[in-house]
Structures are given as structure tokens and as C-alpha cells.
From Swiss-Prot:
Subcellular localization(s) per the UniProt record: Cytoplasm
Quaternary assembly: Monomer.
Protein name per Swiss-Prot or TrEMBL: Cysteine--tRNA ligase
Organism (species): Staphylococcus aureus (strain NCTC 8325 / PS 47)
InterPro entries in alphabetical order: Cys-tRNA-ligase, Cys-tRNA-synt_Ia_DALR, Cys-tRNA/MSH_ligase, CysS_C, Rossmann-like_a/b/a_fold, tRNA-synt_1_cat_dom, tRNAsynth_Ia_anticodon-bd
GO BP of this protein: cysteinyl-tRNA aminoacylation
Motif 'KMSKS' region: where in chain: 265-269
Keywords: Aminoacyl-tRNA synthetase, ATP-binding, Cytoplasm, Ligase, Metal-binding, Nucleotide-binding, Protein biosynthesis, Zinc
Length: 466
């Protein structure tokens, strides 16, 4: 039984799908005017884990994540680079797939694009105008916010509270300061489309409503995105979707926390804006993913190199323990009376499922993985290995790897760099000083499996490749 925190109700709820055995999930994707930053990577990774866990539990997941390929930022970039909006969008959509692919994010069932749904968007807006929920003014089309009675239910704000900060900017032709744009009148030189309202382009909020409706129907199970999208974007999506469809837009709303850089908000003005395209040249993408899921998705996460290094070390320990299990599989025999270990492995798997069932708590799931690695190390160092137990270890390691999306072997597992070997030797020396001989032996065995031989010399431990 999976429970998740629903932003709409502000409480954990048991997940009940619209269709038995199926999950319809929509995740707000990026505006494709640049490479994605690590703030964009967090929802991509977190909701990929959510999808993977649903699938592990037997659900068929229809996972839709859009590309915003028409937007003010894209138009500005187009003017700066003297390139067309579609050219820029194509470049950064390809870059997005490359970056999230490196982070082991699985491809969505569908990645709808705004430009491909322009006729659908225009018709959706026309329907809202016909129903009295929207109106034309000065070439723009606005949504009548007050007409939708449930406005504010996602962000838990009242119309009166919202009115205090609302204003009508120069050039806008709203009936009410709370109204928001569905269609923008074209400006000279901007990309635009013909419509019953005149030349123009859609507003940001209407795009997601239409693509979600087209791909998944009037009501979806889960709508997800970053906390910054809760208001006004998701609030406006609810208003226009429910006004149009006369049905709940999404039964569950999930929002992930922010990313800070060295305890400061990430921003271009502070010079701490980190692009995934750049950071994965310095940090192993598997480590970056492992770091991202080391904190519960709803909690803020602080990015700094010290914490990333801690994640690298933790993932290395898991992988080293799995390597020992694989090595022992070659010499394992049919030994009986080892049910105690089978039971312990099952208990860890049950704990993993329990914490993942509780709002996808990846932080506690990783703790279970560490415990599995610790038990594996203890087993191979203290026992003649049983085929049954080794196979059980391998199966559960694979489950954890598949659900969390972290491979059990690095992409360059067979190409251990000299600097990595030196770090392992330092760690082994420290372990021996602390009389942690099990860890010291584990490192020695791991290096040996890579044909790296350690030699004691008067100058200290040296290594050579066999």
C-alpha cells in the first residue's frame, strides 16, 4: 500500500488509481532555452524514482513530461542569437535528453511540445471563452479567476489574500488584477500563430493544461513538479482545466523541495548557477543521482562538494560490497542451515519497501541499502558462501539498483584511475590504523579483482597493475 503526501490536502494519503493497476502521471518539464541546471535535474530524478517504484509494485505507468518550446525566454534567446525559436528548442531538447540520460533517467512515455499542440490550445481557449471563463481584451485573452470558485485550493490561499498583491501592469487589459493570460497578442518580430483572437501565442499556464488533457484525459492520477510551480502555475492549471473539463484535474499533487548551493539559493546573480551539462564533466553522473536521492524529495537539499564526496564514498561502498558478492558467487556451494541470512536479507528488503511505501522515502531506502552492504561484507568475510544466500543478495541488490536507478557498476568500472586507487589506499591505511580490518581487507580484495597489487615499501604502500 503506497501512501504519498498530497499538496492539495496537505496530508499523506493512500494512493488509489483511477484505473486499477495503472498510474497516469504528468511532470512539468523544462523551458528549453538553455541547458538544464541541477534544480531541473532534481524533479527529473525524483519522479523517475517514483515511476520506477510504482512499476516495481506492478503498476503500468504512463509518464508524461512536456517541453515548453514557446516562451518569453525562448523568444529573448532567439533574438540574442539571431536563430529561430524552433532551432533553439531542438538544440536544448536534444541536450536535455543527453543530460538526463547520463543521470539514468528513463525516457518518458511521451514528451509533448507546445508547438505540436497549438490547434488544441487554441480550441481549449475558445471553449473557455464560450463558457464565460475567459474573455478577449486588446488582442489578449484572460481567464476570469473569480469565476472559478476553487481558486487557491492548491496553494491554500484565499481570493482576498491574493487580491492584496495583485496588480495590472502597463499594457494589460484585464477586468480584474487577479486574471491571468491565456493568449498573448503578437509583438512585432515575435513567433506567432493565427487564432480566432488574432495573431499571438499561448500563455505558459494553458500549455500544460492542454497537453495533460490531450495525453492523459480530463483527470490524471498524479501531477508533479518543483515547489516553485505550486503557485501560480499549478494553481492556474487547476482553474483552467477544471473549468474546461468539469472534472478534477489531478487527484494527487507532488512537489519537490529546492536546491541550495553552499547554503545559498541558486541564482545567476550570485554566480552559483550550476548546469548539469557542466557538472557531469567533473562529478560522476551516478554519484550526482545518488546524492540527489539521499534526501527526501520534499526536503530542501544543499549542494556542495563535501556532500557530493560523501555520496561518492557511500556509493563506492555499496558497489564494493556487491563486487565481493559477485566474486564469491564463483566459489559458492550448496550449503544448508543458512536461513538466518536469508531472513536478514528479507527483513532489509521489507524495510526498503516500507519506507518507499511511505511517500517514497529514498533517504531511508538508501540506509537500507547500506545495511544490505554491511550484511554482505559480514557474510563473505565470516562464512563459507552458500549459492542460495549469494543469489538472494544479488537479487535484492538488483531490486534496489533498479528502483533507485543507480547502477551497481560504474560506467568505467574496468578503468579504475590512478587517483582513485590512491584514495582507496589512503582509506585502507586509515582503516588499518582504526583496526577496521574488515574494511581494509575489503579494499585489498576489490583492488586485487581489478588486477591491482599492493606492495609495502619503506616509503609506504605502493601499487602496480598486474
Amino acid at each position: 500500500m503506497i501512501t504519498l503526501y498530497n499538496t492539495l490536502t496537505r496530508q499523506k494519503e493512500v494512493f488509489k488509481p483511477i484505473e486499477p493497476g495503472k498510474v497516469k502521471m504528468y511532470v512539468c518539464g523544462p523551458t528549453v532555452y538553455n541547458y538544464i541546471h541541477i534544480g531541473n535535474a532534481r524533479p527529473a530524478i525524483n519522479y523517475d524514482v517514483v515511476r520506477r517504484y510504482f512499476e516495481y509494485q506492478g503498476y503500468n505507468v504512463e509518464y508524461v513530461s512536456n517541453f515548453t518550446d514557446v516562451d518569453d525566454k525562448l523568444i529573448k534567446r532567439s533574438q540574442e542569437l539571431n536563430q529561430s525559436v524552433p532551432e533553439i528548442a531542438e538544440k536544448y531538447i536534444a541536450a536535455f535528453h543527453e543530460d538526463v540520460g547520463a543521470l539514468n533517467v528513463r525516457k518518458a512515455t511521451s514528451n509533448p511540445r507546445v508547438m505540436d499542440h497549438m490547434d488544441d490550445i487554441i480550441q481549449f481557449i475558445k471553449d473557455l471563452v464560450d463558457q464565460g471563463y475567459a474573455y478577449e481584451s486588446g488582442g489578449d485573452v484572460y481567464f476570469r479567476t473569480r469565476k472559478f470558485e476553487g481558486y487557491g485550493k492548491l496553494s491554500h490561499q484565499s481570493i482576498d489574500d491574493l487580491k492584496v498583491g495583485a496588480r495590472i501592469d502597463a499594457g494589460e487589459h484585464k477586468e480584474d488584477a487577479l486574471d491571468f493570460t491565456l493568449w498573448k497578442k503578437a509583438k512585432p518580430g515575435e513567433i506567432s500563430w493565427d487564432s480566432p483572437f488574432g495573431e499571438g501565442r499561448p500563455g505558459w499556464h494553458i500549455e500544460c493544461s492542454v497537453m495533460a488533457f490531450h495525453e492523459l484525459g480530463p483527470t490524471i492520477d498524479i501531477h508533479a513538479g518543483g515547489s516553485d510551480l505550486q503557485f501560480p502555475h499549478h494553481e492556474n492549471e487547476i482553474a483552467q482545466s477544471e473549468a474546461h473539463n468539469h472534472a478534477p484535474f489531478a487527484n494527487y499533487w507532488m512537489h519537490n523541495g529546492f536546491i541550495n548551493i553552499d547554503n545559498e539559493k541558486m541564482s545567476k546573480s550570485l554566480g552559483n548557477f550550476i548546469l548539469v551539462h557542466d557538472i557531469i564533466k567533473e562529478v560522476d553522473p551516478d554519484v550526482l543521482r545518488f546524492f540527489m536521492i539521499s534526501v527526501h524529495y520534499r526536503s530542501p537539499i544543499n549542494y556542495n562538494l563535501e556532500l557530493v564526496e560523501s555520496a561518492r564514498s557511500g556509493l563506492e561502498r555499496i558497489r564494493n560490497s556487491y563486487q565481493l558478492i559477485e566474486e564469491r558467487a564463483q566459489i559458492a556451494t550448496n550449503i544448508e542451515n543458512q536461513q538466518t541470512y536469508i531472513d536478514q536479507i528479507d527483513a532489509i528488503l521489507n524495510r526498503f519497501e516500507t519506507v518507499m511505501n511511505d511517500d517514497f522515502n529514498t533517504a531511508n531506502a538508501i540506509t537500507a541499502w547500506y545495511d544490505l552492504a554491511k550484511l554482505a561484507n559480514k557474510y563473505v568475510l565470516e562464512n563459507t558462501t552458500s549459492t542460495e544466500v549469494i543469489d538472494k543478495f544479488k537479487a535484492v541488490y538488483q531490486i534496489f539498483s533498479d528502483v533507485l536507478g543507480v547502477p551497481l557498476k560504474s560506467k568505467n568500472a574496468d578503468e579504475l584511475l590512478d587517483e582513485d586507487v590512491e584514495k582507496l589506499i589512503e582509506e585502507r591505511n586509515e582503516a588499518r590504523k582504526n583496526k577496521d580490518f574488515a574494511r581494509a581487507d575489503e579494499i585489498r580484495d576489490m583492488l586485487k579483482s581489478q588486477n591491482i597489487i599492493l606492495e609495502d615499501t619503506p616509503q609506504g604502500v605502493r601499487f602496480k597493475r598486474g
